[in-house]
């Protein structure tokens, strides 16, 4: 069994992406006897679905967790729901934009994660890691990835979800405007703790509605 951890490459003005750094840092580690496989996703609508579907089919992980950066957020924010919707004012790394199309024309309008995100938020805060629940993963690549992750995890009766993180401090310090941030070490600890918590409680979470 494995844990599949997706991060994203840099995009738009953000020349470093903490989700990539977290996935790389945790790649090859072991959490509760499960090996973590970190995979970096391109910020391209036309590529991420095939990559996510292929990796989940190949690895059949017990948990697939996506991570993305949410510039402007100050806390780690586990996401509750992914919506079947693509909209972007800015293009992806290939210049592609969408104006309200569905991710999956045959899919549900929204899919809830089967990760206990409410309890996860409490756990992170209790361990000194600022966290809050998010009810919107947006409409850009993170929401797109989350929708596919949850959809595919259902096929294997496994766990799937998504967590947004702030910008990391070392990069935020180089941006010429005020912006919330968090230390990379704290975010790595937060994601590791999240995976431990999810795996510990996995039996209660393997139900879908």
UniProtKB/Swiss-Prot annotation:
Give the GO biological process terms. Answer: proteolysis
- Chief site of localization: cytoplasm
The EC number(s) this enzyme carries? 3.4.19.3
Keywords carried by this UniProt record: Cytoplasm, Hydrolase, Protease, Thiol protease
Role of this protein: Removes 5-oxoproline from various penultimate amino acid residues except L-proline.
Subunit architecture:
Homotetramer.
Family, according to the entry, reads as follows: Belongs to the peptidase C15 family.
Q: Indicate what this protein is called per its UniProt record.
A: Pyrrolidone-carboxylate peptidase
Organism in which the protein naturally occurs: Saccharolobus islandicus (strain Y.G.57.14 / Yellowstone #1)
What does the record give as the organism's lineage? Archaea, Thermoproteota, Thermoprotei, Sulfolobales, Sulfolobaceae
């Amino acid at each position: 069994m494995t844990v599949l951890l997706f991060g994203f490459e840099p995009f738009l003005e953000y020349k470093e992406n903490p989700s990539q750094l977290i996935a790389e840092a945790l790649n090859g580690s072991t959490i509760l006897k499960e090996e973590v496989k970190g995979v970096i996703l391109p910020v391209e609508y036309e590529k991420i679905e095939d990559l996510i579907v292929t990796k989940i089919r190949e690895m059949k992980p017990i948990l697939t967790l996506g991570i993305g950066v949410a510039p402007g957020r100050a806390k780690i924010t586990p996401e509750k729901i992914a919506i079947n919707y693509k909209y972007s004012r800015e293009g992806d790394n290939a210049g592609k934009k969408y104006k309200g199309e569905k991710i999956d024309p045959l899919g549900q309008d929204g899919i809830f994660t089967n990760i206990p995100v409410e309890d996860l938020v409490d756990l992170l805060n209790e361990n000194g890691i600022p966290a809050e629940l998010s009810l919107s993963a947006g409409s850009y690549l993170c929401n797109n990835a989350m929708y596919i992750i949850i959809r595919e995890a259902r096929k294997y009766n496994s766990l799937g979800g998504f967590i947004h993180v702030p910008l990391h401090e070392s990069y935020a310090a180089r941006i010429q405007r005020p912006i919330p941030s968090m230390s990379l070490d704290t975010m790595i600890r937060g994601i590791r703790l999240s995976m431990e918590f999810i795996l510990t409680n996995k039996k209660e979470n393997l139900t879908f509605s």
